[in-house]
């Protein structure tokens, strides 16, 4: 054996892919080699002119060691900066059994409720926490961050309000990052933001108002009177409230507000250089059909038992399309679960103890400073002590002394410095900070402390009284509760999830390990730049890789979801055209097959959507595109196009599409949802795209987390780069530094970027190209095998598809009465999550197997769908009645087969339809959920405990 053969830097690619299956898969699709297969699948006109310019792969061990070296360049000071981000303690039982558990982080958004009851219960727990703390009857299952939530509240206020005004009031005490995002959104909604002292809010006519509770500099104001005066005028009032402070303070609902929002980060989610974190959003009942994001509701299943589901989906962007005022899809489910479980584990007494300790430490510190003659700016505060030193020189000295002692403070202005206390603050911190603020080594802190919150501000009602917050306070009980919920969900640690357009690929353990390293997780997003050298190097590495992959000139990492990436890309186009004196360009062409976020995003930017027809092959109708581009030539802003198409085909006319748009004065936005079918074989910038968003949670291995987090960075051509999101508090060292932002943190959900860095580093240039080839091969193998039983709706060159295929169930439905939903639910009995149902074509399933699945797993999935086809035939032949068969009754639970049985099919046919199912049976926890009942009888709070027990 040669010495070089002892070391294989490409070992990870062999873990991510199944090289041993290559010959069999190629033979099944009628090809002799992978090169021949790709050549017969991909149009020659779009092939990359050169190979991928990425480094060679590193082994798992070497990649982890290299990343550890990069991470070590970050400096972990004790953070007292505040501004919505605080050090917290993640309970270890939650860290290990949720955040680090593939049973939680590899699941998808709970569209298939019957196999997501555990996650849905966890999300419902979160909603109940928000309901209890805000005082409102309805809360959603998270938004992307506090700044985005504030912008969503502004849009919702305009939608539901009665005041005929385009002016929105913003409390001057609002976090600067929140105001920055609101400025971005307000401009294209046509709103005027008026920023002023909170007490002056009722001096004008506003359709809505936003107050900060607690203020950015720490003060707590009694907002009840000013809110009352605004309400008398019909203004919709939102309150951005610190989640931990609400444990002690009156709820926003009691203050008279209509909407409450904020960040739940300090409920056990690391700061992570800005994210990901789950924002909460709660509101009055009458606004429930106008609220953004997901809402979990209690319904019932076919047997009449309680069951959970995502409620009121008809108000969401994928239904409302260009009529939507929000493009939010899934948000931050995994972080939502962390925050909700934090409340479950600590319970009401625990969270009160934590909140009281934070407030008491801040009060002790303030009292000591006052007794030493210093001026504490605010008499009433929760956690943040702001001191005015009267001179810039003294403030500089204090700030520097704290920094030298390992503490990051916030510089409020030239003379003021603030220290924000938090869950991890300890007695030694008081001593160190006192020394930095006063220059004295001797100190005495009072043992009996009077808090700084006035009695009239304090909460009088009880919180977290539901049994779920009062039952799991020992670790073994919490561990079992988490395991119980996990076992009710089907995630990728059980079987493949073939959701089309979702790219549910392997989330390798080595990729996940670094996200909990303290060097990445414990950094404040506004920490001094000198302390974030590791993150900056990570970002630079990734920017170079993504530029090489896509062909673009610049990358912005700020968008913290795919929908935000869409918005940011189209925003860059709008800003560019305005800078060119072409603000009048307001027409956006969108193919009929586009995802619902596309028209929703266009509408949010003040664009008028013009739909472009598709032809009989599912491709963009070039003639219709050309006619509409020329018709709107003087007003054409952009086209939003997905490639490969949403129909799973490489459209050969993509260069012509881009050329037609450019010739008529427009820009090309490419939706990167299907980028997994491009890497190493084509580049979006090279075929004509001007901007692209990339789903790191699809193509680049960040897990879907059961509904988030995601990341949607954008790649831009040089002319658009100056118009990407900037940031008001962080120097991004980019051409777009002066622009307003789209997210609260400059680099979005930065702490999950190490996942993608590890994937790129371990795969290397050869592995990344192989991944694309295998994604195509697996998809074509599945399509070929299934075409024996089902029509494949669209194909491209040589009858091939790209990375996903659409199975047409409409003929079968017409003949048998069995619906696409019946087949989706029946797959659960075989142990599989359904593919994407009725998108982009009603009555179909869209299947994307990804490159990660082995032939053995693909064959099991194919066998399940073939078996289901035989079951449908039994209905057609009259062997089973149309109203009583295993498809319409699916899914079947353990309770079904142990109870009375009067069906014309056997128990074995119901739950063990194929031999492989016996080896690893997944039992759905509930029967088919009644969606109509759930929407007509919306309950989005935790039901009584006996419902769980039954």
Curated annotation (Swiss-Prot):
Single GO cellular component annotation? glycine cleavage complex
Cofactor entry:
pyridoxal 5'-phosphate
Q: Per UniProt, which keywords does this protein have?
A: Oxidoreductase, Pyridoxal phosphate
Modified sites of kind N6-(pyridoxal phosphate)lysine: 698
EC number per UniProt = 1.4.4.2
Would I find DNA damage among this entry's keywords? no
Top-level enzyme category:
oxidoreductase
InterPro entries recorded? GcvP, GDC-P_C, GDC-P_N, GDC_P, PyrdxlP-dep_Trfase, PyrdxlP-dep_Trfase_major, PyrdxlP-dep_Trfase_small
Q: Which GO terms describe its molecular function?
A: glycine binding; glycine dehydrogenase (decarboxylating) activity; pyridoxal phosphate binding
Biological processes annotated in GO: glycine decarboxylation via glycine cleavage system
NCBIfam families in the cross-refs: gcvP (TIGR00461), PRK04366.1 (NF003346)
Summary of subunit composition and partner proteins: The glycine cleavage system is composed of four proteins: P, T, L and H.
This molecule's function is given as:
The glycine cleavage system catalyzes the degradation of glycine. The P protein binds the alpha-amino group of glycine through its pyridoxal phosphate cofactor; CO(2) is released and the remaining methylamine moiety is then transferred to the lipoamide cofactor of the H protein.
Q: Which family does it belong to?
A: Belongs to the GcvP family.
Q: What name does this protein carry?
A: Glycine dehydrogenase (decarboxylating)
Give the organism, scientific name: Neisseria gonorrhoeae (strain NCCP11945)
Provide the taxonomic classification: Bacteria, Pseudomonadati, Pseudomonadota, Betaproteobacteria, Neisseriales
